[in-house]
Regions:
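Bacterial N-terminal signal peptides that target proteins for export
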Residues: 2-10
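Extended, non-catalytic scaffold segments that flank or surround catalytic motifs
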Residues: 6, 15, 148-149
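Bacterial N-terminal signal peptides
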Residues: 10-19
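Short secondary-structure junctions and interdomain/linker hinges
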Residues: 14, 52-53, 87-88
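Boundary at the C-terminal end of the N-terminal hydrophobic targeting segment
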Residues: 22-24
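Early exported N-terminus immediately downstream of N-terminal targeting peptides
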Residues: 27-79
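Compact alpha-helical subdomains of small soluble proteins
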Residues: 70, 75-149
Length: 149
């Protein structure tokens, strides 16, 4: 009986201390990003595809819709409009190009620069993940999450 109490006590101690010592979950991996050289090429692609303008125009459209729907005054609409900062969304764009190598990016850049029709139906306006991220970004802007106080 005495040995049974010792084993029960040891079992309880093991059940309490092993989970406390071991790490059961780790932090998620950071999002994939292209190399510095590839970021330069991606920036050129963004410029050639006029995607920065697309992001800002999309956000302005969402702001105008919310302003009309909720009856914002001019000051609030202006404050929210001024909070649009493309740099807050740039990492989402870099992420979709993270798995392209330099040759693929250069080929894509040449296609954007050469064919203006290609710019309107480009990977950035047809990528569902990026469009979803853009929609979330625009909603956050409308909610005022990027207003600096």
């Amino acid at each position: 009986m005495k040995n049974l109490k010792k084993f029960a006590f040891l079992a309880i101690l093991l059940c309490l201390f092993i989970p406390a010592v071991s790490i059961s979950q780790t932090n998620p991996a950071p999002p994939a990003m292209p190399t510095q050289q590839n970021k330069i090429i991606v920036d050129k692609i963004i410029e050639a595809a006029h995607y920065k303008t697309y992001v800002v125009d999309y956000c302005l459209t969402k702001i105008n819709e919310a302003s009309a729907k909720e009856g914002w005054n001019d000051q609030k609409a202006m404050e929210i409009t001024e909070s649009i900062n493309y740099k807050n969304f740039r990492d989402a764009i870099y992420n979709i190009f993270a798995f392209y190598d330099e040759v693929e990016l250069e080929t894509l850049l040449k296609a954007y620069e050469k064919d203006t029709a290609y710019q309107t139906t480009n990977i950035m306006t047809t990528n569902k993940v990026l469009l979803n991220n853009l929609d979330i970004f625009a909603r956050d802007i409308v909610k005022g999450k990027y207003i600096s106080k």
